[in-house]
UniProtKB/Swiss-Prot annotation:
Known role: Specifically methylates the pseudouridine at position 1915 (m3Psi1915) in 23S rRNA.
Family: Belongs to the RNA methyltransferase RlmH family.
UniProt name for this protein: Ribosomal RNA large subunit methyltransferase H
Organism: Dechloromonas aromatica (strain RCB)
GO molecular function ontology, one term from the record: rRNA (pseudouridine-N3-)-methyltransferase activity
């Protein structure tokens, strides 16, 4: 199974890319993970709907066919690390690749939210885009460490 973080946005600072790379390289082989940056649509005189439609097409092109669709959304499930680990375990049992979508400045097309297999919320706080990417990568690694009984995660 592969975990693909698909993030609409511009190039991130080195600390974001290096942090994500560090957590992703720690992932076990059976859970290969990657971050793919999706170029945002140039604003110009386009409406929000036009921007999101163009980005939707780019996201679809980057997704592996048949992937479980997980949307990061402010109204998504607010999970603890242990609950995320259980969710990840369920995804692993399903066997499909997982596409985790992080929308751009204007969010994600509503169709993604409606078709999502899961909707997750990283925080009630508004996070900078790069921080959301890094936090997601770290939490995916932490969830795996819980499942593997690795000492990275200490409970209580």
């Amino acid at each position: 199974m592969k975990l693909a973080v698909l993030a609409v946005g511009h190039r991130q600072p080195d600390w974001v890319n290096e942090g994500c790379a560090e957590y992703l390289k720690r992932m076990p082989r059976e859970l290969a993970a990657s971050v793919t940056e999706i170029k945002p649509e140039a604003r110009g005189s386009k409406t929000r709907e036009q921007l999101l439609a163009a980005e939707k097409s780019r996201i679809r092109d980057a997704m592996a066919a048949g992937s479980r669709l997980v949307v990061l959304d402010e109204k998504g499930d607010d999970l603890t690390t242990l609950k995320l680990a259980k969710r990840l375990e369920t995804w692993m049992q399903d066997g499909r690749d997982v596409a985790l979508l992080i929308g751009g400045a204007d969010g994600l097309d509503e169709e993604f939210k409606q078709q999502a297999d899961d909707r997750l919320r990283l925080s009630s706080l508004t996070l900078p885009h790069g921080m959301a990417r890094l936090l997601l990568c770290e939490q995916l690694y932490r969830a795996v460490s819980v499942l593997k009984n690795h000492p990275y995660h200490r409970e209580g």
